[in-house]
């Protein structure tokens, strides 16, 4: 076994990637697969799962190490059933990626639709962290499993973005809860960390960053580039390294409660 395989290899590991059919979730799933882990992709949409599995099945030697499951991560009952089904089909999971999240629209404070506000909070904070972390944490403690949880924080975890009130609140809370849950679960050998993606153009934010008529950057898109020392948007594949690092007990066995920005320097633009 090479040094890199020993340090970063995930052979024998079983990962659940909640929200694993999204753009970021698929990349994280692919990274874990390539590092040797078995991967169960969770999503509410079977169609999305099928599309993700079609792509992920091209990873060499993925047969028998890859599956998908329709799970609502905001439901304690469904998450527990999903965990049990994963254990039956791939083995007991010891890695959890909390990848559910997103935003719906943008509005001035006084025009914010509170129904949408609550929906975004639920998506990012309840389904995107609390429910899976609670269920997996309990299962791991009862079965004496030293697991690893990776949450998704955001640039909004550190500084609020304009007009996305619920997303700002949820991602700030995600950073706080990453530290809080890491502190509480540490005595059980469970690590909790996060990755904070910078600005990556995807389905949910494309309209905010790129003018759909001209194909040019919007004013917001230009502002992001101007505040990013690397001078560009990120590529989702650039999240793979941090994913494998945090999942590895050898490489990150003494790392817990941290959020790793993968942002091209966005957070230090004012230095």
What are these regions (language model features)?
Residues 154:
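Residue(s) in the substrate-gating loop at a strand-loop-helix junction
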Residues 107-109, 113-121, 224:
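Substrate-binding pocket helix/loop in short-chain dehydrogenase/reductase
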Residues 128-131, 194, 216-251, 255, ...:
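C-terminal helical subdomain
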Residues 14, 21-22:
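Conserved glycine-rich cofactor-binding loop
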Residues 112, 160-168, 180, 208:
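Active-site loop-to-helix junction immediately N-terminal to the catalytic Tyr of the SDR YXXXK motif
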Residues 2-6, 103-106, 244, 250-271:
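Short C-terminal tail/terminal secondary-structure segment
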Residues 133, 170, 178:
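Active-site helix of classical SDR
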Residues 138-141, 183-187:
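Alpha-helical segment proximal to the catalytic Tyr-Lys
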